[in-house]
């Protein structure tokens, strides 16, 4: 079975995905991917999704409707919002490995809505702070989550013999893609069938790269894998941006890795870098992403929050520039709503 799951070109016929549900390049379906673990994929996906959904006038970021999809069997996206895994009834595993019939079930049945995410964050914060009332900033009104759990690790084997196994997520997204401004997919630290599903459903890839030596080798391997997926599975897939994470400005090695990535893909590298900060790592324990938990400041507990807010703003500006390039001045969801009112 492991051989069948290996990502080899001969396993996938050319242009297996001829029509993607997100053919339009201005639709933001973005896979946060890197086959190397420990590069802050989940932290980046969670904080980016939360910042885009929350919005901030001070940061110059309007609120957006966001869907966060967790395709990592560790299920840390739910934990980041204080959701107890034992209380989650339906997950990405139930959606992708559904056996009830040929058609996939409606995806919205599997999503945790904003109200439940807000309640989970506030309950988790209160429980870990001696029963105190949670601060009002621990709320998010525009974010939906498709959670995962450890059962998802078996989905690759279960799906390996199924026709269209690479397109399960794409098919599930098709009916709801226009309901959201951004769909962000967190992927596992490997390039198996789950990551392939993410990159088949997406039209963009965002790559967090850890500012350490081994990251350079992993980065080159990932670029080759993305090129193969573009040729064989999803020709609409493009690299949206590369974010340097775990950066230590005092380290010569960190600066060297950042310079090397910049020399390879200068137009794709985000100007914002994410430092290795304890408060960012501690935030999930409090049951909320750092962008919601900590007020953005230049130092102290809010430094990591400021960096992720800045990254979200840079992401937003890239999206606006891309949409202007394609002659689109509004978010796709707003265009659809205007059309429906006419």
Where do the model's predicted regions map?
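P-loop NTP-binding core
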Residues: 2-342
């Amino acid at each position: 079975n492991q051989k069948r799951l290996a990502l080899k070109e001969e396993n996938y016929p050319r242009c297996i995905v001829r029509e993607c549900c997100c053919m339009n390049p201005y639709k933001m379906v973005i896979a946060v991917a890197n086959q190397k673990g420990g590069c802050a994929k989940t932290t980046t996906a969670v904080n980016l999704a939360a910042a885009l959904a929350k919005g901030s006038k001070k940061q110059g970021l309007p609120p957006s409707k966001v869907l966060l999809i967790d395709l990592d069997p560790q299920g840390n996206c739910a934990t980041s919002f204080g959701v107890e895994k034992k209380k989650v009834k339906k997950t990405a595993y139930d959606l992708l490995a559904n056996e009830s019939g040929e058609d996939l079930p409606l995806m919205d049945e599997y999503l945790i809505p904003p109200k439940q995410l807000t309640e989970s964050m506030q309950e988790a914060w209160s429980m870990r702070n001696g029963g105190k009332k949670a601060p009002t900033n621990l709320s998010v009104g525009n974010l939906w989550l498709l959670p995962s759990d450890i059962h998802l690790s078996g989905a690759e084997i279960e799906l390996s013999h199924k026709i269209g196994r690479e397109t399960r997520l794409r098919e599930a997204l098709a009916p709801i893609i226009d309901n959201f401004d951004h769909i962000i997919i967190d992927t596992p630290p490997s390039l198996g069938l789950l990551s392939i599903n993410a990159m088949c459903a997406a039209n963009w890839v965002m790559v967090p790269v850890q500012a350490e030596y081994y990251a350079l080798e992993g980065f080159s391997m990932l670029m080759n894998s993305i090129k193969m997926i573009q040729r064989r599975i999803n020709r609409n897939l493009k690299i949206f941006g590369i974010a340097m994470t775990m950066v230590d400005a005092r380290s010569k090695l960190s600066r060297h890795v950042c310079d090397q990535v910049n020399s390879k893909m200068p137009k794709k590298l985000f100007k914002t870098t994410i430092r290795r900060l304890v408060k960012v790592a501690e935030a999930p324990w409090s049951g909320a992403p750092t962008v919601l938990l900590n007020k953005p400041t230049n130092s102290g507990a809010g430094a990591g929050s400021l960096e992720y807010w800045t990254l979200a703003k840079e992401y937003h500006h890239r999206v606006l520039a891309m949409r202007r390039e394609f002659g689109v001045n509004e978010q796709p969801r707003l265009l659809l709503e205007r059309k429906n009112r006419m």
